[in-house]
């Protein structure tokens, strides 16, 4: 039974996902359907959490839009994601950056990882 589930999950998993970690600034291009139109929408922000659960893997991206914090959770292997681009690598010491929710301005900055 378990091997059947694993075989089905292997077929569904995307292979072209770049390596990124918490603290990285990424741009996610997502297909959005509005009425009968289908277009690509870009969402750029800092990765504040990653959950690795095989096919149920997800990551949370946070950005500031018009002074308001906006968070969006993406399923890593979703068919709605066209591509993920890593813009900047961040230097952080925690896996979950939920403390950024309470910080604004310069306090919410993350140092860049140079390697």
Swiss-Prot record:
Disulfide bonds: none annotated. Transmembrane segments: none annotated. Keywords: Ribonucleoprotein, Ribosomal protein. Pfam families: Ribosomal_L19 (PF01245). One of its GO terms (molecular function) is structural constituent of ribosome. The keyword Ribosomal protein applies. One of its GO terms (cellular component) is cytosolic large ribosomal subunit. InterPro entries: Ribosomal_bL19 (IPR001857), Ribosomal_bL19_CS (IPR018257), Ribosomal_bL19_sf (IPR038657), Translation_prot_SH3-like_sf (IPR008991). One of its GO terms (biological process) is translation. It comes from the Bacteria. This protein is located at the 30S-50S ribosomal subunit interface and may play a role in the structure and function of the aminoacyl-tRNA binding site. Belongs to the bacterial ribosomal protein bL19 family. This is Large ribosomal subunit protein bL19. It comes from Buchnera aphidicola subsp. Acyrthosiphon pisum (strain APS) (Acyrthosiphon pisum symbiotic bacterium).
């Amino acid at each position: 039974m378990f091997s059947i589930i694993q075989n089905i999950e292997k077929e569904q998993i995307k292979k072209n996902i770049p390596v990124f970690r918490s603290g990285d600034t990424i741009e996610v291009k997502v297909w959005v359907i509005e009425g009968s139109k289908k277009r690509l929408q870009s969402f750029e922000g800092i990765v504040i959490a990653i959950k690795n659960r095989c096919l149920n893997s997800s990551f949370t991206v946070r950005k500031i839009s018009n002074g308001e914090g906006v968070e969006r959770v993406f399923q890593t292997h979703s068919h709605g994601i066209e591509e993920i681009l890593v813009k900047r690598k961040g230097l952080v010491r925690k896996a979950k950056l939920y403390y950024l929710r309470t910080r604004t301005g310069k306090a919410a900055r993350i140092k860049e990882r140079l390697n």
